[in-house]
Amino acid sequence: PDIDNFLFKAIQCHFETIILTNALLLNKQRIDMIKKGHIQLGISLDGMTSDTHDFIRGKGAFDKLIRILKILSLEDIKFSITCTINKKNLCQIDEIIDYSLNELGAQTLFLNRLRPMGRMNQNTNIVLSEQENDNVYKLYLNQKGKYNKRIILADDSALKSNSHDNKIVCAAGNSLIAIDENFNVYPCIYGIDNPEYKMGNLIDQNLDVIWKSSKWNIFRGNLTLEDLTDCRNCKLHAVCVMKNCRLKPVYEGRSFTSSISYCNK
């Protein structure tokens, strides 16, 4: 309800601002403010038909979104597209890539492979098989040769580590934090609402005080590979970075030192 006031404040602050949105509430006034403030947008596009996109985003979302995306493109507003790949839209990925990067002129296309986490544990019928995951990765490598840094496979299994250090260090608590609607501070979004990983509250404490708390140490190298119950015995632990993410297993109901459920190694 306060988006107009937020946009006004963002323009005044002269900060680099990126808003993640479904774009459905963008109107002419808000688009003008976004353009004036050089605000960047991150928008989800999960299919090239209403059948595939609306399956994830709700009935009627696709037609509204396409209309708004065309306006943003004409207004030369900077935006990126995020697509979550699942069984229903897998056959449209080539089309989504072409439409996003060529026709719309999106700065970047982020591809995420749907993982069996959260609500997806009850919707495993649309989660990609191991073979389909491999096919997506091959498609990504092929398209990356054409689009370079404009296309990014953003999920964790695409990442590799060349570190030989046994310390477990995550971006959470080092280069990012998550703040909920009550100004509670967490290491990342997977810790939100988990009291064990609440690092402080911005109403009661200064961010600098919260940031310097010893609570962060388990994300800053105090944990080592030997402390991990599953990953320490994996032959790929030297190159895999999924071991560094400790809150995804917690989010899944596992322990802090467990591996994530979709690791097949």
Task: Label each PLM-derived region with a short phrase.
Residues L26, H53-I56, L128, I151, ...:
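Short clusters of hydrophobic/aromatic residues that line enzyme substrate/ligand-binding pockets
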Residues P1-R115:
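Radical SAM/AdoMet-radical enzyme domain recognition
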Residues T52, F110, T124, N166, ...:
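Glycine-rich, flexible loop/turn motifs
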Residues I3, T49, L65, I93, ...:
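A structural signal for well-ordered alpha-helical scaffolds and beta->alpha junctions
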Residues Q92, L114-N194, E226-L228, N233, ...:
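A C-terminal junction/extension of Radical SAM enzymes
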Residues K36-G37, L104, A172, T229, ...:
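Structured loop/turn residues at beta-strand edges in well-structured enzyme cores
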Residues I11, K35, K70-S73, L101, ...:
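Alpha-helix boundary recognition
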Residues I192-K265:
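Flexible mid-to-C-terminal extensions adjoining Fe-S/redox cofactors in radical SAM and related proteins
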